[in-house]
Amino acid sequence: MRIIDFPLSNCVNSGIRRIGVLTQYKAHSLIRHLNLGWGFMRGELGEFVELLPAQQRTSGSWYNGTADAVYQNIDIIRAHDPRFVLVLGGDHIYKMDYGSLLATHAENRADVTVGCMEVPLSEATAFGVIEVDGEGQVSAFREKPAQPKPMPGRPDTALVSMGIYVFNADYLVDRLQRDSEIFDSAHDFGIDLLPRAVAEDRVFASPFRDPRTGERAYWRDVGTLDTYWAANQELIGVLPELDLFDTKWPIRTFQVQGPPAKFVFDDEGRRGMAVDSMVASGCVISGAHIRHSVLFSNVRAEESSRVEYSVVLPRVVIGARCQVHKAVIETGCVLAPDTVIGLNPEHDRQRFEVSPDGVVLVTPEMLNQKLDYIR
């Protein structure tokens, strides 16, 4: 499963079947995943998930900002002639019915609607911060301010953009055209288009809440090692906020074809087992102990090794008697027998990358191993 499967699944579950995925450079792995896992749309019914690399029609460069990425594909928007355009980020984990967001947009007769979340004020510097009036109309938008403004009556909380936007299609085309002609524009939705739209047009905020409880819904930005690790840990809770086993709102993906996971040996000291974990197909737990971890496909853990509070990506080999704690092990790594990771921060920093929260990132390059895939 990949992060982009969440917004794509949200689209399909919401009845949205005309989807363009804007890809930047080094996109081979993403393109392969989409071709394998998202080719079920019915083209004869006008459905598609279409890959849209930089067209380079207006310049010889790649996408130069989020707004420029959409602008370079403006002819595709015109060709399909939609009433609304939904713009989403591909690096967030959440479940959302976009139909409700579109309905709110239409009811408000808005030009733009911004999906938003309430976050602790201390975290708001990483987001676009929104201020709204009593009707929900956005009165100010500041991208990643050094001193974010709290919500009225809630000094410890700020309202921030989720990077989810609904535009009236004609309005979006016009504003993208205008932005392309501004020499010093960063061609970014948060930096350029939204502040101008707030000053000139009807921009509304739509807070993302759980429809059952009315409380803040689950949403995670996983742009850092710490947030990526934490989101994976949350998925394997007994009653996770975001349930991958919810058949009413399935998260679709490309399933690697392989045999079921296998757990072998039942001797003291080398018992093959996994507790509070998710283990994908093709894994072999050969006398190893896996605890509170996520193992992607085709991982092999050898006898007497222990993996705890970790995320192990595909095709990793964990040798005998290894100890891995609070780590992210990247695709294709081979850990030699008796390797210890995550128990000595100073030692880890000499070989690997250690995050502010103490998560250890291990890549094949750090192990002086050749990559068996193209980044």
Segments from the language model and where they lie:
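Left-handed beta-helix
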Residues: 170, 178-375
